[in-house]
């Protein structure tokens, strides 16, 4: 199975830009890959929230909203499965989510991050939620499981992930290490951690092009 890990430019809170970038990558790699995987919070950017729920709820995207519909339509048109991260609005709650959509445009899996590192716990309330567990699903004949960023660094979670025995573990992250840090040590730490989580673990990180961002 040909899986493309797309490290794409992201601008915080610029959903139109981020969505267009995602769609352009899908179009460019149709016929060249069977699944294209984007990083954590690709649609809104990792630093898109301010922890004021009345403001943040307008940043969240529901499964029925136009951006998701457009991605589903593109997956069907290009016959290309896609997995991407976003802040999902579900009722009165927000989640850091990873959606996987099949080449028929149908939702294959919806994963909610299980660790709290996506939010400022000192400023958030019950509106900001996490999922409970990892789960295995099938796409194009292979079994997959998803863990978002800090999920696979959380005590007990690597063992939980490995126990699923998925063919492929998708590990979308949002990291801001300098090239020197990454190449000197951090990439080896991630490789060691990935080995604890499964046989084939695929890490993908977007890159932030927002000049006002802190990273």
What is each of the regions a protein language model found here?
Residues 79-85, 113-122, 202-206:
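Short Pro/Gly-enriched beta-strand edge/turn motifs at strand-loop
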Residues 7-25:
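N-terminal phosphate-binding loop and adjacent alpha-helix
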Residues 61, 89-164, 177-192:
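Active-site catalytic loop in hydrolytic enzyme cores
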Residues 1-5:
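Extreme N-terminal starter segment of soluble prokaryotic enzymes
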Residues 18, 27-54, 75, 82-83, ...:
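Active-site beta-strand/loop signature of hydrolases that rely on acidic residues for catalysis
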Residues 13, 46-47, 179, 211:
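Glycine/Thr-rich phosphate-binding loops of Rossmann-like dinucleotide-binding domains
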Residues 63-81, 153-215:
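CN hydrolase (nitrilase-like) catalytic-core segments centered on the catalytic cysteine
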Residues 56-69, 126:
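A short acidic, glycine-rich active-site loop
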């Amino acid at each position: 199975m040909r899986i493309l890990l797309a490290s794409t430019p992201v601008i915080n809170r610029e959903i139109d830009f981020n969505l267009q970038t995602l769609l352009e990558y899908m179009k460019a790699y149709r016929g060249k890959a069977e699944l294209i995987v984007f990083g954590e919070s690709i649609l809104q950017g990792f630093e898109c929230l301010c922890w004021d729920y009345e403001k943040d709820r307008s940043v969240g995207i529901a499964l029925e909203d136009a951006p998701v519909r457009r991605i589903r339509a593109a997956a069907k048109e290009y016959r290309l499965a896609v997995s991407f991260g976003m802040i999902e609005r579900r009722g009165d709650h927000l989640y850091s989510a990873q959606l996987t959509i099949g080449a028929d445009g149908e939702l294959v899996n919806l994963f909610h991050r299980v660790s709290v590192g996506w939010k400022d716990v000192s400023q958030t309330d019950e509106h900001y939620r996490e999922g409970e567990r990892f789960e295995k699903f099938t796409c194009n004949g292979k079994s997959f499981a998803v863990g978002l960023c800090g999920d696979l660094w959380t005590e007990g979670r690597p063992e939980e992930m490995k126990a699923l025995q998925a063919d492929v573990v998708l590990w979308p992250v949002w990291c801001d290490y300098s090239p020197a840090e990454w190449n000197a040590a951090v990439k080896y730490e991630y490789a060691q951690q990935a080995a604890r989580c499964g046989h084939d673990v695929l890490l993908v990180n977007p890159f932030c092009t927002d000049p006002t961002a802190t990273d």
